[in-house]
Amino acid sequence: MNRHLARRPLAGLLAGLVLLLLAATAVASSNSITLNLKGGYRNQQRTACSARHHYTLYHGGGTLKMDGYVSPAPALPDGTWRVKIKIKQCKGGRFVAIWQRHARGNGVLLNGVKIGHFRISYRMRRKGYFFARAYYYGYQPRIRSQDQHFRVTG
């Protein structure tokens, strides 16, 4: 048997696997979630827990309002799907979870496309450096927003 002929099916199989992997990655990356922090009185670059980030500053005792979007909108009735919001604080040189809640979501039209929207509030009782993150577990793999860093001052 000719070795070149035996390698062709293997090369074709490898090329097919690469295309399948790229397609799966593209499908997974088409799902997204965003988280937006509302308000704040100033922005600054700071280092907390050994990492430098952009922080939005808020006064302690106030309420941090957040909202975000899940795209595409979950194929569930409005109010039945939920997004988990987690807040972590810099303590002892690392970020630790201090608060988490679930926000109900509903579909909205944005530029003629249905996407999912959610909103939630957090009472800022502690001073320090924090970040908030949103998760949606209805898609596999689950999707996670970028970290939104903020600082609560006195």
Label each PLM-derived region with a short phrase.
Residues A28-T63, Y69-S71:
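Short, compositionally biased P/S/T/A/G/V-rich stretches that sit at domain boundaries
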Residues G61, D78-T80, R125-F131:
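Extracellular Ig-like/FN3 beta-sandwich strand-entry sites
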Residues G12-A23:
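Bacterial N-terminal signal peptides
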Residues M124-Q146, V152:
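Enriched for extracellular/lumenal, surface-exposed ectodomains of secreted and cell-surface proteins
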Residues V96-V113:
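Solvent-exposed serine/threonine-rich low-complexity stretches and specific carbohydrate-binding patches
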Residues N2-L14:
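Bacterial N-terminal signal peptides that target proteins for export
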Residues L110-R123:
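Exposed aromatic-hydrophobic patches
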